[in-house]
Amino acid sequence: MAFRLKSDVRLAGSWLCLRGARALGTRAVTASKASVLPFEVIPQHQGNKRQRVLQFWKEQNHDDLHLEMHQTFQELGPIFRCDVGSTRIVAVMLPEDCARLHQAESPYPHRMHLEPWMAYREHRRQNLGVFLLNGPEWLSNRRWLNPNVLSPKAVQNLLPMVDTVARDFSEALKQKVLQSAQGSLTMDMQPDIHKYTVEVSNFALFGERLGLFGCNPSSQSLKFIHALEAVFKTTTQLMFLPRSLSRWMRSQAWKEHFEAWDYISEYAENRIQKKYEELARGCSQYNSIVANLMLQGNLPLRAMKANIMDLVAGSVDTTALPLMMTLFELARNPTVQQALRQESMATEPNIYENPQRLRMELPLLWAAIKETLRMYPVGLFLERFLTSPLVLQNYHIPAGTLVHLNLYSMGRNPEVFLSPEHYNPQRWLENKETYKHLAFGFGVRQCIGRRLAEVEMLLFLHHVLKSFCVETAFQEDVKFAYRFVMMPTSAPLLTFRPVS
């Protein structure tokens, strides 16, 4: 195997493919470009809208939604329509359709409200943050937040903090391995990775460490993690039904949902108040996103709390899943893993001296993360309400339609990705086409925490792979369920051995 450093990393030799996987294709629609076809002739998902609402009502979960949508694309082609209640939806899955959506985007890209989260904020008379807002108020909040969360300067400030947490995690894992009599450690990594993402999020937002890597994390820290888990679990149970139905059908889920948000709300308020008191005592240096927002003084306190709650909820599972699945894929693709380890070891001195060069120094590792997100997207789809008519796949889509861009089906489409069943990071070094890496969205409404998430994942994998060989006896594909975000139904055990 040949290996070159920097941006022209090259791998020669065979790539190990996913065991048991099969190629998944989508029948293409070949419509004449001479005339645009009316909305009514778009292939339609079977079943009327009342039946679909009753189905959501009857079922306790929607675990296979990604598989159902994928099968529908295979049967009907790259575009289809359906109604859920009173909402008219068009589903697409090709990069060209994302490009058209982006080109037609208004200054205020409009997304569907997440009903359970909206219900909590309204009932508690709290402000909405950027995740839930639409229109000019969304843009105003976003402009206040972007310089402190998304900008290159913001990431430059946050990167040393994330690096500290990633190094501490690797060191804590090393201590666990050394304490093992076998000289290696086999474990379910989900809980530990979850602790890592919560630790990073809390440190970046509030400038405080939670101490989650120790033997006895505080009960307050564990309660915070449980509250985050409860929000996501109950969101899935409630999001598909109108409040008028779910209030009496799923009253226990509403109770758990509100209790979890109450804890997160109180947690955020206490941390914001503590930071305010620190700044009042003259601690004016940069040490967190909240501190910087306060020093600038542009964001009203109620709006700050609302946005911090959004950032807290959105910053954990979005990185935990890709980290776990990257470790799993590297465990069953040892040739790829070794190439990444060589890259990390060769570039460690440069990264240590200048952490800002992280992405430039680790192109293959970044490609591996993109490949993981292609195969295992955290979000099932991106969505936009059309503010003006648009043509997609030669069909007229009227204004007011909700368009779903399905990431799972795009990533599994052989017309978009050659041999999509193969875990092949190299494809991202060779292919520079846009609108294929969409895990963090697109346009002005892309994920506000994407750059923080990117360095969080890069630094975690960089430090872990330098220190450990990762193995697994589990060679089957991991099954996933849709639970507001994509989640594995069970986690494969991973074995960590110190690098000799």
UniProtKB/Swiss-Prot annotation:
Disulfide bonds listed in the record: none
Pathway: Steroid biosynthesis; glucocorticoid biosynthesis; Steroid hormone biosynthesis
Origin superkingdom: Eukaryota
Catalytic activity: a steroid + 2 reduced [adrenodoxin] + O2 + 2 H(+) = an 11beta-hydroxysteroid + 2 oxidized [adrenodoxin] + H2O; 11-deoxycortisol + 2 reduced [adrenodoxin] + O2 + 2 H(+) = cortisol + 2 oxidized [adrenodoxin] + H2O; 21-hydroxyprogesterone + 2 reduced [adrenodoxin] + O2 + 2 H(+) = corticosterone + 2 oxidized [adrenodoxin] + H2O; 21-hydroxyprogesterone + 2 reduced [adrenodoxin] + O2 + 2 H(+) = 18-hydroxy-11-deoxycorticosterone + 2 oxidized [adrenodoxin] + H2O
Gene Ontology cellular component annotations, sorted alphabetically: mitochondrial inner membrane
PANTHER family for this protein: CYTOCHROME P450, CYTOCHROME P450 11B2, MITOCHONDRIAL
Family named by the database record: Belongs to the cytochrome P450 family.
The protein's name: Cytochrome P450 11B1, mitochondrial
Organism: Cavia porcellus (Guinea pig)
